[in-house]
Amino acid sequence: MIKGANGSGKTSLIRSICGFTELSEGHVKWNQLSIDDIDSSFQNEIAYLGHKNGLINEISAIDNITMNPNIVDLNELNDLVSGFNLDSVLDKPVEILSSGQAKKTALISLILSKRSVWIMDEPYANLDQASIEYLTHRMDLHTQSKGMIIRTSNQGDLSESPKLDIVLES
């Protein structure tokens, strides 16, 4: 987990880890190689959720989710929809969803991506307590399955997963 005050560089750091922006100092390595020296194929292992949810506002929540070609397990999709309590809004355009409902839609897409590395900027923002607990459970399942999670947070950590805290100071 990457911790730090607002403006300390948490978002900049995770965007650099993803290869979206360059670091002013230091290097990001993937399998012991600097990401500057390899092609972008390492990004195929990363599922990223930033402050913007990456959804298409004009289409429904379910259409956003099912655009993901990796969805093969409809039982898991149904479990996620139920776990995040999105059943009643699946057919609604994202533009009329609350920020929490849109965030849950984006989180379902991230979880269903089957990527080994989840990178999330403030994943608990805009979520109700039940959804925070459900997301924490899903993150624990991901790390128990040998997945890795890099995330920023201004809140406490509910996860049972092993972690390394990185604290940024301004």
Question: Language-model segments: what does each one mean?
Answer:
Residues 18:
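Helix-to-loop junction immediately C-terminal to a conserved catalytic motif
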Residues 52, 57-76:
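Q-loop/switch helix immediately C-terminal to the Walker
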Residues 75-90:
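Conserved ABC ATPase "signature" region
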Residues 112-116:
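A short, proline-enriched helix->beta-strand linker immediately N-terminal to the Walker B motif
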Residues 107, 146:
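Hydrophobic anchor residue at the start of the ABC signature
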Residues 23-42:
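Conserved ABC transporter NBD signature motif
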Residues 93-100:
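Conserved ABC ATPase signature
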Residues 118-122:
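Catalytic Walker B motif of ABC-type/P-loop ATPase nucleotide-binding domains
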